[in-house]
């Protein structure tokens, strides 16, 4: 039986594509393994998926771009993770390794290369993360969502592979219940801040609940169960799975962080959106770059977190609603998306 090893983690964005691809390989008779951190979100997501995947936990160290005494300790953690990954590779003898990035992916990528296993990696953002910059040196090929510099000879630009589609599905009963609390004469705004929510969005909704619910139906994916609430013109919930796409479809506008997975999902369904990217003080600036790219393409509006107020947000919402047809036309004309089926076929061809 053919074997494939997946790796990637730290955030949902480093796991999502793997979760989409693994069932395809299982259906085709592959034995699927995953290398990650048992304390990480990658392990949680695989357990929730119920997929027939063997999980191997390794030591991990965070890759920091700044000086910290913890870097010294993490060098040893990464080194031990490489040794653990090498033993896994030598024991399994897989046909390939597919990495979605995140610091946990570096040891398996290095170990795969050392043991002669072809390495395929995927980069979602406009600029490579530190983990993928390291992984690229050991990779057979990198697939990218955005076009990369021509000097990167091992990169193939494939566009975004998303988990949502423009196909309409029957409304879940829970969605029908939510809609009974909404005023259908008001626009619906969805706040989504990634796998852990976004405190800045949560605070905005909390501080201005009265004003917001007078003018909009508000959906707030919080990442915090203590904020759960269903009341007139307001639905706050910590986490959703099956409701994710239905809520996106229900919304007239989405207010989101600038993670590539989410914004390309919005592009796939031509949904109006305002991007509030993580700042450079909290990230490497990749979300700022992603947001600027989407604004330049005419897909979205952006708003820096430092400028986020009720007034500034409402100005963006009003602009999007007033120019809805223009934004949606540009999104529908986009050639930057790839279906999961097409990407899977491309990957299988490269593996053969």
Swiss-Prot record:
Gene3D superfamilies: Glycogen Phosphorylase B (3.40.50.2000). Pathway: Cell wall biogenesis; peptidoglycan biosynthesis. One of its GO terms (molecular function) is undecaprenyldiphospho-muramoylpentapeptide beta-N-acetylglucosaminyltransferase activity. It is a peripheral membrane protein. It holds the Pfam family Glyco_tran_28_C. Disulfide bonds: none annotated. HAMAP family: MurG. Cell wall formation. Catalyzes the transfer of a GlcNAc subunit on undecaprenyl-pyrophosphoryl-MurNAc-pentapeptide (lipid intermediate I) to form undecaprenyl-pyrophosphoryl-MurNAc-(pentapeptide)GlcNAc (lipid intermediate II). Belongs to the glycosyltransferase 28 family. MurG subfamily. This is UDP-N-acetylglucosamine--N-acetylmuramyl-(pentapeptide) pyrophosphoryl-undecaprenol N-acetylglucosamine transferase. The lineage of its organism: Bacteria, Bacillati, Bacillota, Bacilli, Lactobacillales. The gene is murG.
């Amino acid at each position: 039986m053919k074997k494939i090893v997946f790796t990637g983690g730290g955030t949902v964005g480093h796991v999502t594509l793997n979760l989409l691809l693994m069932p395809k390989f299982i259906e085709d008779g592959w034995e699927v393994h995953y290398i990650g951190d048992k304390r990480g979100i990658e392990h949680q997501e695989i357990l929730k998926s119920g997929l027939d995947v063997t999980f191997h936990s390794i030591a991990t160290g965070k890759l920091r771009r700044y000086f910290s005494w913890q870097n010294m300790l993490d060098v040893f953690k990464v080194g031990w993770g490489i040794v653990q990954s090498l033993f896994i590779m030598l024991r399994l003898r897989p046909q390939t390794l597919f990495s979605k990035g995140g610091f946990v992916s570096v040891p398996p990528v290095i170990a795969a290369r050392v043991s002669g296993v072809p390495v395929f990696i995927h980069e979602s953002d406009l600029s490579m993360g530190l983990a993928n910059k390291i992984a690229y040196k050991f990779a057979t090929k990198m697939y990218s969502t955005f076009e990369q510099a021509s000097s990167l000879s091992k990169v193939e630009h494939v566009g975004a592979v998303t988990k949502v589609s423009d196909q309409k599905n029957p409304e879940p009963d829970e969605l029908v219940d939510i809609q009974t609390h909404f005023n259908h004469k008001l626009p619906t705004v969805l706040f989504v801040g990634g796998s852990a929510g976004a405190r800045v969005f949560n605070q905005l909704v909390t501080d201005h609940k009265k004003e917001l619910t007078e003018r909009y139906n508000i959906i707030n994916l919080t990442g915090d169960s203590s904020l759960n609430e269903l009341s007139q013109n307001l639905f706050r919930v910590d986490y959703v799975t099956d409701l994710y796409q239905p809520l996106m479809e229900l919304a007239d506008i989405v207010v989101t962080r600038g993670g590539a997975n989410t914004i390309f999902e919005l592009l796939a369904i031509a949904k109006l959106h305002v991007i509030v990217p993580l700042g450079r003080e909290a990230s490497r600036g990749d979300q700022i770059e992603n947001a600027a790219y989407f604004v330049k393409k005419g897909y979205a509006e952006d708003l820096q977190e430092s400028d986020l107020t009720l007034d500034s947000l409402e100005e963006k919402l009003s602009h999007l609603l007033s120019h809805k047809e223009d934004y949606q036309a540009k999104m529908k004309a986009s050639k930057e998306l790839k279906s999961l089926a097409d990407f899977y076929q491309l990957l299988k061809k490269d593996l053969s």
